[in-house]
């Protein structure tokens, strides 16, 4: 069948996302317990080139690029596109940030309630709610391998927001079509690979992860735009 028959929430997308989420949990358990990924299954199999968690993030961003582009091109409503995206991101993000700050923090912190709420880092953590990654809560998980770190996976939120913005700009510039997408795809991949190579050599793993996530999102965009030429057996 042709890929244009893709329905978004059918085709086992939900199940695939569940598997990816499980892979993230399993993958993160290794560095949280051992302090590094040396014993993580995929990390060992690929000689340190990938982890289950990283591949799972690629899957999430791929489907995000696919579904977001589908939504934008079908509705063709630029004015509400970004607002609709924020409506999907903000409620769960704010729930996690608020619960972590005002419920989890006071319960598990080694500091007293007064010390906890008088610490500036407690309030800085709320910046996660506006897509500024701050991972530390004072006195929380101090004896862990990564002390004070809470919800480290929230780094993906601003990256996804940037991807939404790029998708919208490409739509406004009329780049999301079968004629322009292949050349644009080649150029984007070359630029992203060059950036990844530079930062990989500098050992900036977070930047590399963000760049590869963006590449996955763009791949999802590309697949949807070129859906009429893609056959699935």
Regions found by a protein language model. Give the residues of each.
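Short, Lys/Arg-rich, polar N-terminal cytosolic tail immediately upstream
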Residues: 1-9
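Membrane-helix interface linkers and caps
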Residues: 2-3, 68-85
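Functionally critical transmembrane alpha-helices in membrane proteins and complexes, commonly lining
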Residues: 11-72, 90-93, 97
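Alpha-helical transmembrane segments and their helix-entry boundary regions
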Residues: 13, 77-81, 89, 156
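Specific transmembrane alpha-helix
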Residues: 21, 54-73, 156-176, 185-233
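Transmembrane helix-loop junctions in multipass membrane proteins, especially transporters and channels
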Residues: 36, 40, 74-75, 105-116, ...
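Membrane-interface helix-loop-helix regions
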Residues: 44-52, 94-161, 165
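Alpha-helical transmembrane segments of multi-pass membrane proteins
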Residues: 83-96, 171
């Amino acid at each position: 069948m042709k890929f244009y028959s893709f329905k978004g929430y059918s085709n086992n997308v939900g199940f695939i996302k569940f598997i990816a989420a499980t892979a993230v949990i399993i993958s993160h358990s290794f560095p949280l317990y051992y302090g590094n990924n040396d014993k993580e299954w995929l990390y060992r199999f690929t000689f340190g080139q990938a982890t289950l968690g990283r591949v799972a993030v690629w899957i999430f961003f791929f489907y995000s690029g696919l579904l977001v582009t589908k939504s934008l091109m079908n509705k063709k409503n630029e004015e509400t596109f970004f607002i609709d995206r924020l409506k999907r991101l903000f409620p769960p993000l704010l729930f996690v940030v608020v619960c972590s700050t005002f419920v989890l923090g006071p319960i598990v912190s080694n500091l007293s309630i007064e010390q906890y709420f008088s610490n500036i880092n407690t309030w800085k953590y709320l910046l996660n709610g506006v897509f500024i990654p701050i991972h530390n809560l004072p006195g929380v998980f101090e004896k862990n391998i990564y002390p004070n770190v809470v919800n480290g996976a929230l780094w993906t939120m601003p990256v996804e927001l940037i991807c939404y913005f790029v998708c919208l700009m490409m739509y406004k510039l009329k780049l999301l079509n079968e004629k322009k997408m292949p050349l644009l795809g080649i150029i984007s991949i070359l630029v992203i690979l060059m950036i990844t190579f530079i930062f990989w050599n500098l050992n900036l793993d977070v930047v590399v992860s963000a760049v590869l996530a963006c590449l996955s999102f763009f791949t999802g965009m590309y697949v949807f735009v070129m859906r009429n030429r893609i056959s699935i057996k």
